Amino acid sequence: MKYHILAFGAGFLMDQIFGDPYFLPHPIRGIGWLIAKIEKVLRSGNPQENSPEREAAERRQGKLLVVIVLLLTGMFTALILVGAYALYPKIGMVVEAVMTYQILAARCLQVESGKVWKQLKAGNLEAAREAVSMIVGRDTQNLTEEGVAKAAIETVAENTSDGVIAPMLYTALGGPVLGFLYKAVNTMDSMVGYKNDRYLHFGRAAAKLDDVVNFLPARISALLMIGAAFLSGKSYNGRQAWRIWHRDSRKHASPNSAQTESVCAGALGIQLAGDASYFGKVVKKPYIGDPKRQVEYEDIRRANRLMNRTAWICELLCLGILMVVAV
């Protein structure tokens, strides 16, 4: 337990300081490569399109994808971790710290959304659209300056749970093996969990599992973010964060996505969400938050500060609980 606590804290600090070095291969990209390869193999020889047999086959294949990816991810990460600790406990601790570092994405989220902020600040709307297209799934080519800023803020808010708090909680609970299993589920959902013609049936299992594993972490993330809003000074409104979360946290097709998004909207006093275009089709969405003022590019940095303070609160709470359990 002592080594797990030290590795957990060190991994968090490494993410805060270094983020993701783009020149190095990242295990999450490896999981993405694995998902793509398995999908290609499973889909070969499918029945004719738009037939009941094809729909049933795709659902079976989607379930098999989930099982194979989770088995391989769990076995591979467990082998690395157990092997490192078998060599020498301190080597195991270092390996666990590096694995924890690779699971978390707070710094990466700040850097990528910061690129959007930088281009908007410079008045370069086209470059800002290009930058935000790297971190959102919607069509960005026709977004206004406010639309670009909103898209970046929504990504920061939603990924406070998906990319920071949820993986942190799972890693604290079960070490990097459980952390990477969570990331595998999350990556499958981001790759095949779309409700379009290609993935409606094939990605159903991954999308449903992602909803399940994020249900509690999303709500814990929202509560932690409300706490961060109360502790973050006059730029944030903790009471409004609580009110908007209570009112708007279910205004999303996903049971989890609006949890932290509603808190962020309330804390900043802005309105998020609304209709968006995906693959050329407009998707109707309810608004989240109240339009007390216009969204501006500086709100991207405010959202990032709120995300980072939420991450620190979660890290300190997890470390405290782990230390109490270890006594």
Residue ranges and their predicted role:
Residues 186:
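Substrate/ligand-engaging "lid" and interaction regions
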Residues 189-190:
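Glycine-rich phosphate/dinucleotide-binding loop and adjoining beta-alpha-beta core of small-molecule
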